Structure formats: structure tokens, C-alpha cells
Regions:
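Acidic, Mg2+-coordinating active-site environments of NTP-dependent enzymes
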Residues: 2-156
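Active-site beta-alpha connecting loops in nucleotide-dependent enzymes
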Residues: 140-143, 160-175
Length: 175
């Protein structure tokens, strides 16, 4: 199998338990780009992550096209996020145009992941205007940091599947 587009969100402790070392873990993640992504493929990379920059450099050296995503200067740049009890509003810039999207996703990391996925769709050939219009209809995945109820004290009750101790921290911080 050869992929046309692959995405890199981040390099964290989340799945480290499957690998003997961090180096082995990064080599496994990098394998998606150097063994499965085709030479003419698109690498969509979060460049706010230090390992994202390492991966970006490696993909460019192989001649793969790269689309960058992040808060720093990027092809798809996150300009701001505002949060409320129903989700977040994301302001971003892509191809010289600003887009504002309201989505029912709790937590900054979910907005960042959404934009990385959007970058993958753009790399696959979608038109930006149609894509950002479609993002407005995104729905949340139950169990992935959603707010199914409000307690009698008016405090929100959150449900989040966090498979490792390392994944509890960003979920907790998002609330």
C-alpha cells in the first residue's frame, strides 16, 4: 500500500509503552512517512511539535510535498481559539484567506487535530472554501472529551476516554 497523504499531529508519551525507547517510537511514527507515504505524497505536519520539524526536514529531503499546520507561521495557521460550554471557535488562515469555524469540540488539542485533518483533505485536493464550510457540520465523538450532562450545581460533567496517564493531562487541562 502507498499513501497519497499522511499526517503527523504530535510526539507525546501516549503510545510510548509499545516501544522500548523514544527513539524507537519516533522511528515507528516516521515509518508512515518514509515507508508508506509515496514519493509524490503529501506530508501534513504539525510544526509546533519539535519532532514535527524533524519530520518536516526529512520529508522535504525525500522530495515529498509538505503542508504545515500550527500556531507558528504555517500553510494552515491557527490564529486563535475561543472556548465555551458548547465547544470552540477557531480562527485560522489558509492560502491567504481567514476562516472562522465553530465546532462542538472541547479542548484546544481537538481543534488542532481537526485542522491537521483539514490540512490532509486540502492536500488530497479539496477546495479550501468548501472544506471550511463543511467543517461547520463536524460533530463530536462520544467519549472523546464531551460534555454529556450538567450537574445540579451547574457544573459540567465531562466524559473522556484517556487510555494512558499521559493522555489524562491534556484532557484535564482542556476542561
Amino acid at each position: 500500500m502507498v499513501l497519497a497523504v499522511a499526517g503527523f499531529t504530535n510526539f507525546t508519551q501516549d503510545h510510548r509503552d509499545y516501544h522500548d525507547t523514544f527513539e524507537a517510537y519516533f522511528a515507528a511514527k516516521s515509518g508512515l512517512f518514509d515507508r508508506v507515504l509515496g514519493p509524490q505524497g503529501w506530508a501534513v505536519i504539525n510544526i509546533d511539535d519539535a519532532k514535527g520539524m524533524v519530520l518536516y526536514d526529512a520529508c522535504r529531503k525525500r522530495g515529498q510535498s509538505c503542508l504545515t499546520v500550527g500556531r507558528s507561521i504555517a500553510d494552515l495557521q491557527i490564529l486563535g481559539q475561543t472556548f465555551d460550554a458548547n465547544g470552540q471557535e477557531i480562527l485560522c488562515a489558509c492560502q491567504g484567506t481567514r476562516y472562522q469555524v465553530k465546532v462542538p469540540l472541547v479542548g484546544g488539542f481537538q481543534g488542532e487535530n481537526l485542522l491537521l485533518a483539514a490540512g490532509m483533505v486540502l492536500a488530497a485536493g479539496a477546495e479550501a472554501e468548501a472544506l471550511f464550510s463543511a467543517l461547520k457540520s463536524v460533530t463530536l465523538v462520544r467519549g472523546r472529551l464531551h460534555l454529556p450532562a450538567t450537574l445540579s450545581t451547574r457544573a459540567p460533567f465531562a466524559a473522556a476516554y484517556a487510555p494512558t496517564p499521559a493522555s489524562v493531562t491534556p484532557a484535564s487541562a482542556a476542561l
